């Protein structure tokens, strides 16, 4: 043979895929191997080229090449093939020798075709390819689970995830997948003790003698069922056993962010970065928290660091969107959309897109984004976004239904109760009900300032300014929070107590110099105190429009 195919296998084994692809082109074009007289050799050569393309992520070319190989394989005379039909694919995983070159496996080829379709978001084609594979490896089963889940075939996804755990109980992505699909911890754990051939059982003590894996399953099931307090307790127990575990710290920070423990979540994410400064997982969630705290210097540094690690990841595009929101909403939206194009199952991308569309007064489009996030995995942010989107375009019934759905899913969540209150507060006839829901939220979680601010706003709308002041001053004794000072300043401004208003805007800015509401409120108040109409349009402001190019290179953003 003019081109030794074992050399291509060696190149692939050592990760030299560019060279393997170039050499593969020589191999498949060699006239010494005829498709008519040597279909098996032709198939083997094409598989080698396909493997090089597969590893280069040239998935469309890989699919085409593998299918050519399968076509030639069907032409191999059965009596002279010397191998069974189920063993067509070249194995490059073991040491390269003459026997490994000719030992090929059809199932492996079909798996790679399906994996390429999956990478191209062609789920149906991937499933169709895998259905012809009857005996599946662990990696084949995890792919099938993902494919079925992406297609909405949850029962099939559950079955394949469970099969993964029967083959190996430590496939943690299968544990998370099952938890998110509503499978109980007991049911998941029972899969550990069944072997893949279903003919024997092993004890849980053999698999998980210290029970950490069982606790991990329980924690993920708590997260999926919105039992966040239980999840935090279980993650804390695991962290005592595995301190400085980046994955556990990240999972804990995400739960803390969901329940509004923003300061704790920020500290947790900082610890993650101190242990592993190059991790990208959930760093967009961290960026959102920094934005809430108006900590723009840390946000800017975070985005700069993420870009230097990998500028192609969905998390990085969401973080860029967060950074640009204050400067240019259009550019921010384009980055949120890029994150979804990179990974169409990346929930923070949809949340960010929904928030930006809502701010741009496009509630119908925002609702679509929040619904997409909700379909992937329901959490409080998608519920909140949907409710506020529905209210913004007058769909009060839909808003109330969604808020109640959140309350039923999270009965111990003060935020969910507040969400129902927000819908009732939208109409004058529902304000008394809103008050009851806000107060119920505060009984459930006395330190939940979101309910305090909503209740104060309700008092203000009803003309009970004194009640609003009393409520806010009472909470300020225990919580030195800038948002409480801003709301109190707004109440005083509404009652023309301008000096008191000034003092609380200033107090808010002392706590958080980046608080945008305090800055705008103070500017407006100072105009009032000077006798200038704060609503008058400044001609200079009208002309001061910056033209920002939405396609600015990431490297220039800092």
From Swiss-Prot:
Residues 519-558 are annotated as: Disordered. Component of the anaphase promoting complex/cyclosome (APC/C), a cell cycle-regulated E3 ubiquitin-protein ligase complex that controls progression through mitosis and the G1 phase of the cell cycle. The APC/C complex controls several key steps in the cell cycle by mediating ubiquitination and subsequent degradation of target proteins such as cyclins. The APC/C complex is required for the female gametophyte development and is involved in several aspect of development by controlling cell division and cell elongation. Involved in the control of endoreduplication. Belongs to the APC7 family. One of its GO terms (cellular component) is nucleus. Pfam families: TPR_19. Pathway: Protein modification; protein ubiquitination. Keywords: Cell cycle, Cell division, Mitosis, Nucleus, Repeat, TPR repeat, Ubl conjugation pathway. This is Anaphase-promoting complex subunit 7. It is found in: Nucleus. InterPro entries: TPR-like_helical_dom_sf, TPR_rpt. It comes from the Eukaryota. TPR repeats lie at residues 43-76, 138-171, 212-245, 246-279, 314-346, 348-380, 381-413, 414-448, 450-482, 483-515. Residues 535-558 have a biased composition (Acidic residues).
């Amino acid at each position: 043979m003019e081109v030794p195919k074992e050399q291509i296998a060696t190149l692939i084994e050592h990760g030299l895929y560019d060279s393997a692809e170039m050499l593969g082109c020589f191999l498949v074009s060699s006239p010494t191997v005829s498709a008519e007289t040597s279909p098996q050799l032709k198939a083997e050569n094409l598989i080698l080229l396909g493997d090089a393309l597969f590893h280069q992520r040239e998935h469309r070319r890989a699919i085409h090449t593998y299918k050519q190989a399968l076509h030639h394989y069907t032409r191999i005379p059965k009596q002279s093939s010397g191998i069974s039909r189920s063993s067509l694919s070249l194995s490059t995983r073991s040491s390269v020798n003459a026997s490994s070159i000719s030992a090929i496996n059809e199932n492996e080829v079909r798996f790679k075709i399906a994996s390429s379709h999956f990478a191209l978001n062609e789920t149906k084609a991937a499933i169709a390819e895998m259905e012809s594979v009857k005996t599946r490896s662990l990696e084949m089963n995890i792919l099938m689970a993902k494919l079925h889940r992406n297609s909405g075939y949850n029962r099939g996804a559950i079955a394949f995830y469970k099969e993964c755990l029967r083959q190996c109980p430590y496939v943690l992505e299968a544990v998370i997948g099952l938890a998110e699909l509503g499978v109980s911890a007991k049911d998941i754990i029972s899969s550990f003790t069944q072997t893949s051939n279903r003919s024997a059982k092993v004890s849980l003590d053999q698999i998980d003698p210290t029970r950490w894996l069982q606790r991990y399953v329980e924690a993920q099931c708590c997260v999926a069922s919105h039992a966040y307090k239980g999840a935090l307790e279980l993650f804390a127990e695991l962290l005592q056993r595995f301190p400085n575990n980046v994955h556990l710290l990240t999972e804990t920070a995400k739960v803390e962010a969901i329940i509004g423990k923003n300061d704790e979540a920020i500290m947790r994410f900082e610890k993650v970065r101190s242990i592993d400064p190059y991790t990208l997982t959930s760093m967009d969630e961290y960026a959102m928290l920094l934005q809430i705290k108006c900590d723009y210097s840390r946000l800017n540094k975070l985005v700069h660091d993420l870009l230097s690690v990998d500028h192609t990841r969905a998390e990085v595009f969401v973080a860029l969107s967060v950074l640009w929101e204050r400067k240019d909403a259009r550019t921010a939206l384009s980055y949120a959309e890029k994150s979804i194009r990179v990974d169409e199952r990346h929930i923070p991308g949809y949340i960010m897109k929904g928030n930006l569309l809502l701010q741009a007064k496009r509630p119908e489009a925002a609702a679509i984004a929040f619904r997409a996030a909700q379909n992937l995995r329901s959490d409080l942010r998608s519920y909140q976004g949907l409710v506020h989107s529905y209210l913004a375009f007058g769909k009060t019934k839909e808003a109330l239904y969604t808020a109640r759905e959140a309350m039923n899913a999270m009965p111990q969540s003060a935020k969910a109760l507040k969400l129902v209150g927000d819908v009732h507060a939208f109409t004058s006839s529902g304000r008394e009900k809103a008050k009851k829901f806000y107060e119920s939220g505060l009984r459930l979680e006395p330190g939940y300032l979101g309910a305090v601010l909503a209740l104060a706003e309700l008092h203000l709308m009803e003309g009970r300014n004194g009640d609003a002041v009393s409520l806010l001053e009472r909470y300020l004794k225990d919580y030195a929070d800038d948002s409480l000072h801003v709301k109190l300043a707004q109440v005083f401004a509404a009652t023309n107590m301008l000096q008191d208003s000034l003092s609380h805007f200033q107090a808010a800015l002392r706590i958080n110099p980046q608080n945008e509401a305090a800055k705008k409120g103070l500017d407006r108040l100072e105009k009032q105190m000077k006798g200038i109409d704060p609503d008058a349009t400044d001609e200079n402001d009208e002309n001061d429009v910056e033209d920002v190019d939405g396609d600015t290179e990431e490297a220039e953003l800092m």
